[in-house]
Amino acid sequence: DRTIEAVELLQLPAPKFENSDNAFKVFIYTYKPFEQLTTQEKLRALYQHVTLLFIQQDFATNETLRLRFGLGEKKASLISKLVASAKESRLIKNFDPSSESKRYVKYVPVWA
């Protein structure tokens, strides 16, 4: 989790982890603006952000995700679309599915 914290602090693309027979590899990438990240990179960063906050006994929100990606409020729709894609891909879910609020939704990993 220290790696993910450092990556988030610097707003770097999410690291990629690979496990092979004889080695465990971590790929750390240099900074890229949100617009240059691939969909997979965005989803990986979103998932790692949600998971990191969950293990810290906190919740991800649209606001924390905007901060993670270095986006202002004017680009909130980009985060909303990414969240919808992450839910569709079964990476995350709403913490409280019965909540009607769209503005203050809290997200957790789908396995939580």
Question: What role is predicted for each listed range?
Answer:
Residues 1-112:
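C-terminal regulatory or interaction extensions
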